[in-house]
Amino acid sequence: MPKYFAEKVLGHWLYFTTHCILEAMHVHASRDSKLREKGAAKFFVYADGSSRMMVQGTLRDHEVPVIQAFIKQHYLEMFAKWQELSDNGFYGETASR
């Protein structure tokens, strides 16, 4: 499962799965080193870098805005990684290819 970055953010891996590429660009956040979706938070990412949390998972309330700020700061890098495997664009858009 592709990680967006080699390092964790607040102790969470940020990643997506090969099953995820059928949806719009999004980010899972999980402490689980096996990157299972169970317990993972899920954020759909808009074209401006803002995100919408769809599932909180095991994230604590105070961690949510920190993860969202990180996504906003790095969303273009993350999107480039996403596009290596997916034809789908940002949340609310149609396929980019």
Where are these regions (language model features)?
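Generic detection of intrinsically disordered/low-complexity segments and helix-coil linkers/edges
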Residues: 9-10, 20, 37, 64, ...
